Amino acid sequence: MKRVSQMTALALALGLACASTWAADMAQALNFKQLAQKQGTAIDTRPSAFYNGWPQSLNGPSGHEPSALNLSARWLDNMSDEQLNAWIQQHQLKSDAPVALYGNDSDVQAVKSRLQKAGLQQVATLSDALQDPARLQRLPHFEQLVYPQWLHDLQQGKEV
């Protein structure tokens, strides 16, 4: 009987730990309206081509959230801490102001980690990112820009 009680207590403790982790993750998510009300900044962690306006997939979202910055996770390996701090200063991000990231989970996690390491304290995810096509913005004349993958394929001698 004592063993059953111990197992029950362990199961409850694990359940509470999972629930608190889930609650913490939920608390770290903001929707676009909440971010705007808090005067926060959205950051797109996807490759720049998608931020510029190229769709991620056939009939997929095209562009970026209004006033979003682009900090592609692909840049992180090439950015020193000093360069990232300069980027943060250039964009006037404050350590105590909310920042909401969007992109795929691994890109968001990579950027979140580096921004927190750089001292930003309120790093969340943007829960409704790329869900309202009418809200998305594109760089002017983005379609005249050469898509990076096309250029890479051309340089590799592949058919383009």
What is each model feature region?
Residues 1-9:
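Bacterial N-terminal signal peptides that target proteins for export
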Residues 3, 19-20:
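Glycine/proline-rich, flexible active-site/cofactor-binding loop segments
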Residues 9-19:
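Bacterial N-terminal signal peptides
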Residues 21-41, 45-160:
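Rhodanese-like catalytic fold shared by cysteine-dependent sulfurtransferases
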